[in-house]
Amino acid sequence: MVSVSEIRQAQRAEGPATILAIGTANPANKVEQATYPDFYFKITNSEHKVELKEKFQRMCDKSMIKSRYMYLTEEILKENPSLCEYMAPSLDARQDMVVVEVPRLGKEAAVKAIKEWGQPKSKITHLIFCTTSGVDMPGADYQLTKLLGLRPYVKRYMMYQQGCFAGGTVLRLAKDLAENNKGARVLVVCSEVTAVTFRGPSDTHLDSLVGQALFGDGAAALIVGSDPVPEIEKPIFVMVWTAQTIAPDSEGAIDGHLREAGLTFHLLKDVPGIVSKNIDKALVEAFQPLGISDYNSIFWIAHPGGPAILDQVEQKLALKPEKMKATREVLSEYGNMSSACVLFILDEMRKKSTKDGLKTTGEGLDWGVLFGFGPGLTIETVVLHSVAI
């Protein structure tokens, strides 16, 4: 008779979880940051708020963002004036948009990832879907399963309302699933649409205005699995270690609340300070066992919550400017896409590494780190190993 331990052994993969493919997608509507303040104050009927507009213009100028992509066009906003008012009851209108658009955008990214992976979609065993945009039953995971035509017995995990750290969360969960289920192939999708947070400006809620200057829409998808099939599957990164922690004394630093007016969010001014204060401890925990203490010797993928976070992390760790190049590039081209951001940066890094003729997918380096920061204040850490190109 077979023992439980023998069954357990047979159920586990032999090797570590690897990222086998990456796909990304954005809405067609591209917004230029330089002209966005004019558009935003006009569409929200707020042009009389001259000082507030000047303040918003300064926020946009300092954001280090050149462009963003948004589902919300001028036409859609004119048809839904409740979204343009500050705190007007508008949840129904927002929900009607995002329950359709979130899985649709996720499908676009997933189709690209599946194509790169090169295996039939029938080999997908697990699906992780993550979004901060809207809640519904059955969820976006179910809708995506239908849209892609996945098998009805794919094992699904739906993560709602996680926020900006969740790009790390989905990797952590995908790693555990891939390594503990022999032959598992996990489709990971993060899809974010700002229709839940868009609203007119207010003198009394400046952190909402910060969000209007930073957030953009995007979806990213990965295929994750252990023991890649030779000749067919080509690993891009190996996931070595993961952690999640709540930063001490950070309660209320970032939070969001779903209300009749949509998703409202609040952040303390010292969010960059809290992140930079706790980053060293997270790095020591992750890299001391590997004998790495020079953080300029690893590649970097950090959630670009805003330029101030990146600036303070660089300063605290004395990082060379090029360490955050891929991160800043994604922030500049797309804005803050919440959970999808770090997955876009993974894609940017591996493409640029190949284009520049470097030896590995991680800018020619072997080891790297991926950080997610978000509500809590929660920090996700993922240790990555690159793959030879």
UniProtKB/Swiss-Prot annotation:
Gene3D superfamilies: 3.40.47.10. GO terms for molecular function: naringenin-chalcone synthase activity. InterPro entries: Chalcone/stilbene_synt_C (IPR012328), Chalcone/stilbene_synt_N (IPR001099), Chalcone/stilbene_synthase_AS (IPR018088), Polyketide_synthase_type-III (IPR011141), Thiolase-like (IPR016039). The active site is at C164. Keywords: Acyltransferase, Flavonoid biosynthesis, Transferase. It comes from the Eukaryota. SUPFAM superfamilies: Thiolase-like. Its EC number is 2.3.1.74. Pathway: Secondary metabolite biosynthesis; flavonoid biosynthesis. It is an enzyme of class 2 (transferase). GO terms for biological process: flavonoid biosynthetic process; polyketide biosynthetic process. The keyword Transferase applies. It catalyses: (E)-4-coumaroyl-CoA + 3 malonyl-CoA + 3 H(+) = 2',4,4',6'-tetrahydroxychalcone + 3 CO2 + 4 CoA. Belongs to the thiolase-like superfamily. Chalcone/stilbene synthases family. The primary product of this enzyme is 4,2',4',6'-tetrahydroxychalcone (also termed naringenin-chalcone or chalcone) which can under specific conditions spontaneously isomerize into naringenin. This is Chalcone synthase 3. It comes from Trifolium subterraneum (Subterranean clover).
